[in-house]
Amino acid sequence: MTPLALIMIIAAYLLGSISSAVLICRLLRLPDPRTVGSNNPGATNVLRVGGKGAAAAVLLCDMLKGTIPVWLGYYLKIDPIILGVVAIAACLGHMYPIFFHFKGGKGVATALGAIAPIGFDLTGMIMATWLVVAFLFRYSSLAALVTVLLAPFYAWLVKPQYTLPVAMLCCLIVLRHHQNIRRLLDGSEPKLGQKKSA
């Protein structure tokens, strides 16, 4: 691994560690998303506690945390596997942020942002899948899980050289959703627009 690759991996983790949800909620004087709703500092929980505007801001910032380091690596023609590690580092920063006591989000938006530089076709397929599943079933977590399970197949169709990095990233997202999977199975997972009961 080259020094440049190592620097990019560390920088991606540190950028990912900036918790958009916590900072935006502080700025807007909203409750800390780590202590209300689903206790997850992500766009879906901010939607529950702060509305669409705050959630959209969090979504955009979380995506940029993945897009910026991966786009830079893609521009510098870093090996696809290393690029995958950079993407994972950004997501790990979001999930376990060093600046916020390692209590972070699920990494879905950051992962989408990390995949975006690979191509608009792949990004469009991923976003369309999430939107369709979310619209039909009203579960953000289910939409995320279905999307990440299909994402490696989409990558294989349009950019096969990135199939393994995308699959690595998706495995991380699935593991991070283990509690959501349990709640989906027992019927206690809150739907979109529904406040999580205490």
From Swiss-Prot:
It comes from Vibrio atlanticus (strain LGP32). It is found in: Cell inner membrane. The lineage of its organism: Bacteria, Pseudomonadati, Pseudomonadota, Gammaproteobacteria, Vibrionales. This is Glycerol-3-phosphate acyltransferase. GO terms for biological process: phospholipid biosynthetic process. GO terms for molecular function: acyl-phosphate glycerol-3-phosphate acyltransferase activity. GO terms for cellular component: plasma membrane. Catalyzes the transfer of an acyl group from acyl-phosphate (acyl-PO(4)) to glycerol-3-phosphate (G3P) to form lysophosphatidic acid (LPA). This enzyme utilizes acyl-phosphate as fatty acyl donor, but not acyl-CoA or acyl-ACP. Probably interacts with PlsX. Its EC number is 2.3.1.275. It catalyses: an acyl phosphate + sn-glycerol 3-phosphate = a 1-acyl-sn-glycero-3-phosphate + phosphate. The gene is plsY. Pathway: Lipid metabolism; phospholipid metabolism. Its main location: membrane.
